[in-house]
Amino acid sequence: MCSSDLQVIVVRQAGGTIVAMINSCPHRGNRVCHADFGHADSFVCSYHGWAFNRDGSLAGVHEEQAFRSDPNWRPESVGLARVAQVDTYKGLIFATFDADAPPLRDYLGDFCWYLDVMLDADEAGTEFLPGVLSSVLECNWKIAAENFVGDALHAGWTHDSGARAIFGGPVKELAGGESYHASVDGHSWEFNLDEIGNAATLADRRILDYLRSRREVVEARLGPLRARMVGAISSVGVFPNFSFLPGQQTFRTWAPLGPTRTRLTTWVLVNRSAPPEVKEAYRKGVMLTFSPAGIFEMDDGENWEQSTLVNRGWVTRHQRLHYGLGLDTRIDHDELPGIVHRGQVNEANQRLFYARWTELMRGPQP
C-alpha cells in the first residue's frame, strides 16, 4: 500500500489481528514486498536475502553465520518497522505513525453515525470489488479533498455536459429543499434526502431497483433519516484525505506527492450481500463516471489542476479566495450530530475542513 512516497505492508495475522509495517528492509532500505495485494507467508529482500515473517520479525539472513559471529548482532531488533497504531471500523483499516494520536473511535467521534450510512446499511457488511484504479493528478491534495467535503455547488456547472449525456438534461437544482452540511472535527458530509440522486448517475436501473427494494430493511437498521441518505446526492470526506460518494460507491484516497502532485487511488465499495449483477453494475458505473477516463472525473481533474497551476505564482498565492457562502446558515438539528448548516449549496464544510487543517498545522511542535 502506497501513501504518498511512503509504502507500508498491511498483513492479517493468523489470529485475525492486523499488522502494518514499513515496506523497507532495515538492512539497506530495499523494498521487500512488490505486490499491491495477495497472500504471503514471508517477505524476502532481493538485495542481501534478509527474510521476514508475516509479523515483520526477522526470519533469517543470507550468510547467517557471519552475523552470528558479530557480538553486537541482535536479530530481534532488526525486524520491519511497525506502524504505531492500527485499528478498524466496520471493515476499514486505519493506521497512524503517531503513537500519541487518539484512539480511532475517539478520532472519528460522532462522525461514526454518518459513516454507518455507507458501512453498516446491511447486516452482511461491505466489501471492495476486485481491482483498483490509480492515477496522478497535477494538483494539491487539499483542493481535491475539499471538493468532497462539501462542494455540491460545482456539480450543476462543471458536470453539465456529462449530465446531459447521461440524463438528456442538466443537473437538477440543488439549492433549497431538505439538505445539509454536517461536520465533526473536519470530517464532513454534505447531502440531501432525495434517496437515489447519486445512484442515478450510474445510469443503471438495476442499482435503483436494488436500493428501492431495500428501503424498509435499511430504515429498520438505521432509522428513516439515514435510510434516505444511502443513495442520495452527497459527498463525504474523512479528515484529512479519504473521500467517498454514497450511492455511487466510489471510495478514494488523496496521497500528496508534493505540493502540486496527488496520487488518487479509487475502489468500489458495495454491500457484501448484493446480487452479482448489482455489484457488476456498480463497477461499470464507477468506470463510467469516477475513473481516470470517467465522465465526471475528467471534469474535476481539469479544474483541480488548473486551480493549482495558476496559483503557483507569488502574487496569486497571496490573493484571498472567497469561502463565504452560507455564513449564516448554522442550525441545531435534533438528529444530526456535529456542526450542522442548512443547505447543500454551501461552503460551511470547506471552512471547517481548513479550520481543522490550520489547527493541526499550528499545533505544538514535537
Question: Where are the regions that the model predicts?
Answer:
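Short, small-residue-biased leader/transition segments that mark boundaries at the very start
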Residues: 1-3
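A short loop-to-beta-strand scaffold at the N-terminal edge of the catalytic core in hydrolase folds
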Residues: 6-11, 18-19
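A structural signal for short hydrophobic beta-strand segments in well-ordered beta-sheet cores
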Residues: 10, 50-52, 85-86, 254
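Short beta-strand micro-motifs enriched in acidic
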Residues: 11-13, 35, 255-257
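Long, hydrophobic, well-ordered secondary-structure blocks that form the structural core
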Residues: 19-69
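Short solvent-exposed loop/turn micro-motifs enriched in small/polar/acidic residues
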Residues: 43-44, 77-80, 236, 247
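Short Fe-S-cluster ligation motifs
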Residues: 53-93
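C-terminal catalytic domain of Rieske-type non-heme iron oxygenases
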Residues: 84-366
